[in-house]
Each structure stands twice: as structure tokens, then as C-alpha cells.
Amino acid sequence: MAVNGSALSSGLIVSFGEMLIDFVPTVSGVSLAEAPGFLKAPGGAPANVAIAVTRLGGKSAFVGKLGDDEFGHMLAGILKTNGVQADGINFDKGARTALAFVTLRADGEREFMFYRNPSADMLLTPDELNLDLIRSAKVFHYGSISLIVEPCRSAHLKAMEVAKEAGALLSYDPNLRLPLWSSEAEARKAIKVSDVELEFLTGSDKIDDESAMSLWHPNLKLLLVTLGEKGCNYYTKKFHGSVGGFHVKTVDTTGAGDSFVGALLTKIVDDQAILEDEARLKEVLRFSCACGAITTTKKGAIPALPTESEALTLLKGGA
């Protein structure tokens, strides 16, 4: 994950991109064909982040497109129920809401099968953007799935441009899903510019400072490499280091990274000076790791996102 931008004050976190339905097997360690049943769970990384923010007491909005179908209106209702501003949502009458079947291996890690050819989120156009909402963002968060095809790619780039011109802090989590890209080379082309997942970009399984810093560019304020239960590595212009994670009983890792991001953004939207203070940043990242860890203890992303009190309880208990 990378964060860059200009000074900001307390305000709104706008999350841009996809929201969909995840179908998760009721048992772990089986293929999709072998699964006896599936649990329906709302998901989509940008939407997960938006709800993670409000679950922790922050203020967020979602910008994207859903199908004008039962699933689409259900997802919009979930956002509203969780306190996320929904003024940026559009509905498409000609395309369905995206679906994803998620295979859970015995260790809780995932494999994906997507149904979105095309889905409504892919059809968002620049003219449909709520520009006033985007201009009001103090943090503008996005992923890479919305960069894959037109017209959503143009809408994504327009939204980024408007947010940047308005002085928002830009937050990027690649959320790499190779099955959605036409090729690995095409995926690299899009994410290389924005600094992304270390192993994929460098072609190395080495997680070290040298590899991470190959992603650095002068406009970045913070670069993060998350390491699952091992925590994360952080890099700024002035310092770098690591923060340990938490050992929990992992059921499903879906949404853990989104929970981490939501926690981080909730803390820094009110005080960007945290990014200049290593001790305070480490506290925030430790809190973010706790949120990510809790999210892995239940099936599905949004139902598992923690409250602040739950995260603080885990922090007090240690790792």
C-alpha cells in the first residue's frame, strides 16, 4: 500500500471502486466443486475499506457502480446501514452486480472465480461521478481493479485527478487479482506506476528493504508492505522499520488488508503529522495490524470488520 498527498485536516475518507457479493464455502480446504454450500457475504476491497472506517468511528463515502438488481440494492443498503455515505453510488440497468466465488484453503488463504463480464462496476463513466463528493474528500482511497477496462478506467483517473486537485491525501492498495487482467504484463503496466505489491512488481520472493525501496518515488509519504500475521514493514522519507502482527485463529483472510487500510486511514485523516513521527506511526500501524488480525477470525470481509473496542482488547492482550 502507498500513501501520498498534501496536508489535510479532519474530514471525509472517500473510497472508489468495486463492491460485490463474495460466495465463501461453508467449509475450508475444499475446491469450489467440492463445497457443500456457500455463505453469501458482501465484499469488494474499496467498499470494505469504507465500512472499516465507519466501524472504527470514522467518516467515509463510497463511489462506484452497482447493478440495478436485488444484490446491488442490498449492497447499497449495507453501506448505508454501516454509516457510509452513498451519494456516489450509481446503478446500471443493463449489467449485473459482480459476484466472486472464493475458495478457502485449509490455512484460510483464498483463490477466486469471478462473474463480471461485464459487471456494473466496470461500466462507471466519468460523467456519472459525483465530483462534489470527491472534492470534499480529505483522503481518496482506491485499488487497481477499476483500472482494468474502460469506461471505468477513465472514471477512476478522472476521480483521482479531481481529488488530487482538491488537496486530498491519495491512498492506494493494489488488491491484485490476476484472473481479472488480460495478462500479468498488463497488470504490471497499470500498477508499476502507482507502487504496488512487492513480490509481483519485483519478480522476487525476497521481502527486504532494497526490494521495497525500489518502489519508492519522491511524492510518496508512506509505503507499506503488509506481511500477514507477521505485521508490516513501513517506509517514509525519513525512516523505515517494522511492526509485529498478532497470532489469531485464522478462518478467512478475506478483507484483512482492507481492515488494516481502513484503520490506518481513520487514524491519519485527523492528523497527517503522524506520518512524520515514527513512534506515533508505529502505534497506528500496530492498531491497524490488530484490526486486520481480527478480520481473519470470521468468514467474509464486512461481517468480520472490527470496532475500535475490539481492536483495543486485542492490543491489550498482546501478540
UniProtKB/Swiss-Prot annotation:
Highest taxon above the source species: Eukaryota
CDD domains named in the record: bac_FRK
4Fe-4S found in the keyword field: no
Pfam families given in the database record: PfkB
PROSITE patterns (UniProt xref): PFKB_KINASES_1, PFKB_KINASES_2
Annotated GO biological process: fructose metabolic process; starch biosynthetic process
Entry EC no(s): 2.7.1.4
GO MF annotation list: ATP binding; fructokinase activity
Keyword Phosphoprotein: no
Keywords of the record: ATP-binding, Carbohydrate metabolism, Kinase, Nucleotide-binding, Transferase
Tissue expression remark: Expressed in swelling stolons and, at higher levels, in developing tubers. Low levels found in leaves and stems from tuberizing plants.
Residues passing through the membrane, by range: none
Catalytic function, reaction form: D-fructose + ATP = D-fructose 6-phosphate + ADP + H(+)
GO cellular component: cytosol
Family under the similarity heading: Belongs to the carbohydrate kinase PfkB family.
Reported function: May play an important role in maintaining the flux of carbon towards starch formation.
Name this polypeptide is given: Fructokinase
Organism whose genome encodes this protein: Solanum tuberosum (Potato)
Lineage: Eukaryota, Viridiplantae, Streptophyta, Embryophyta, Tracheophyta
